[in-house]
């Protein structure tokens, strides 16, 4: 010891620093625990005597009973939770019942949640689980997500705070049930209908003055009356499943079209979709969809999407040669996100052909407007990758940022970076980021 000063033990210092979270106010700790699953939240009771009962104050229940074999324990725990929150509010209830749905009294649990000012309700049940009528008049509900549930037909719907409605594989007794839910949600902003079992042959008449985002798939046909709609995501097989009836049009369109019909039917669908695309500023498109458009336009004048400024495209490697044509169709493009994926059919048939993206002419957007490009992939490096990077850097006059979201081993990355820095840049202000 020097100068009579006692050295602080490293373990004491580390222990003190690690326990800083315990010094936080209990309401803040409760908020932190709220964002964990209930299982992880309960585990914190073993940290210290202070933490022993903190999890009980969390205003939410996030359980996966499907992963547990002890039904009685789960039932007792859930009922105890509702009893302890009898006079308080519950912000979140998430239950993943799965195939064990018949072992739990789901209707009484949802009824209990609605009387405790529930805000977020997320229930994954199974085919014959009916949702109680109390859900239709829950005045505090903000976010409703149901999977594999069966809705009953309500006489009255009042959901004054509901902003997000997310239904997956949900069954309806008739075509008016979903319409009542939408019309009874005066502040609804987001609607997701995935594999929705809507009565066959019926078209959903969707009317909402507040809806901003809509996500539908091939199992439902929709006529949309939504003047504030900003983003429409639609997946289609053979036929177009939406029609927009309003003075405006969504700024963003996310289209996935897979053709399984005849030639005439396909031609009509493509023409309808192209009219819609010509009106948007932000487009998300899959490789299958663009390939259908590409083949359709071969004997026709070049497609022109004069309003598109943001493009997010997902391409199979074997279809990358279509990229220049797509860029030529977007003369005012400012932002491009391009994701490369492996073509499953190519892998299956052992085809090794790599595409060539080099063309004799440069698309107008590269010369005049393209400022941001992101290239990403979830596959091993492909043979034409560096040629694609070179194509962008050497032809983009006003490019400000090129982001390369790719994975390399340490050795391969060094070689990639060496080759990258040697590529001349048409834009002197371009910054290249390798993630």
From Swiss-Prot:
Domain of life: Eukaryota
Domain F-box, first and last residues per copy: 18-64
SUPFAM superfamilies linked to this entry: F-box domain (SSF81383), RNI-like (SSF52047)
Residue stretches of each LRR repeat: 123-148, 170-195, 234-259, 262-287, 314-340
Keyword annotations of the record: Leucine-rich repeat, Repeat
PANTHER family linked: F-BOX/RNI SUPERFAMILY PROTEIN-RELATED (PTHR31900), PROTEIN WITH RNI-LIKE_FBD-LIKE DOMAIN (PTHR31900:SF33)
Protein name, entry field: F-box/FBD/LRR-repeat protein At1g51370
């Amino acid at each position: 010891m020097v100068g009579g000063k006692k050295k602080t033990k490293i373990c004491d210092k580390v222990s003190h620093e690690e326990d800083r979270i315990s010094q936080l106010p209990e309401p803040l700790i409760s908020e932190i625990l709220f964002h964990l699953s209930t299982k992880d939240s309960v585990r914190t009771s073993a940290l210290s005597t202070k933490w022993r009962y903190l999890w009980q104050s969390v205003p939410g229940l996030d359980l996966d009973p499907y992963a547990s074999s002890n039904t009685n324990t789960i039932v007792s725990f859930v009922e105890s939770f509702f009893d302890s929150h009898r006079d308080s509010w519950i912000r979140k209830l998430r239950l993943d019942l799965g195939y064990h749905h018949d072992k739990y009294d789901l209707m009484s649990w949802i009824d209990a949640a609605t009387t405790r000012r529930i805000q977020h309700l997320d229930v994954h049940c199974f085919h014959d689980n009916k949702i109680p009528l109390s859900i239709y008049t829950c005045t505090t509900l903000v976010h409703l997500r149901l999977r594999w549930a069966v809705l009953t037909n309500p006489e009255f719907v009042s959901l004054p705070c509901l902003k997000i409605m997310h239904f997956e594989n949900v069954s309806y007794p008739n075509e008016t049930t979903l319409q009542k839910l939408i019309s009874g949600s005066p502040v609804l902003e987001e609607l997701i209908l995935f594999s929705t079992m809507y009565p066959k042959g019926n078209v959903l008449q969707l009317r909402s003055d507040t809806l901003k985002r809509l996500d539908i798939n091939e199992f439902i046909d929709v006529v949309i009356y939504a003047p504030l709609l900003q983003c429409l995501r639609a997946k289609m097989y053979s036929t177009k499943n939406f029609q927009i009836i309003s003075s405006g049009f969504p700024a963003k369109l996310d289209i996935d079209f897979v053709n399984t019909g005849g030639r005439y039917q396909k031609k009509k669908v493509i023409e309808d979709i192209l009219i819609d695309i010509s009106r948007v500023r932000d487009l998300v498109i899959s490789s299958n969809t663009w390939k259908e458009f590409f083949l359709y336009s071969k004997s026709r004048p070049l497609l022109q999407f004069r309003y598109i400024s943001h493009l997010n495209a997902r391409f199979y490697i074997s279809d990358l040669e279509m990229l220049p044509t797509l860029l030529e169709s977007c003369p005012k493009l400012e932002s491009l996100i391009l994701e490369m994926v492996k073509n499953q059919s190519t892998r299956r048939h052992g085809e090794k052909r790599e595409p060539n993206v080099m063309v004799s002419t440069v698309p107008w957007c590269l010369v005049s407007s393209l400022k941001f490009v992101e290239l990403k992939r979830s596959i091993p490096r492909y043979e034409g990758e560096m040629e694609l990077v070179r194509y962008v850097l050497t032809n983009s006059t006003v490019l400000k940022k090129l982001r390369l979201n790719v994975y390399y081993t340490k050795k391969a990355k060094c070689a990639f970076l060496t080759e990258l820095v040697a590529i001349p840049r048409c834009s002197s202000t371009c910054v290249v980021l390798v993630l």
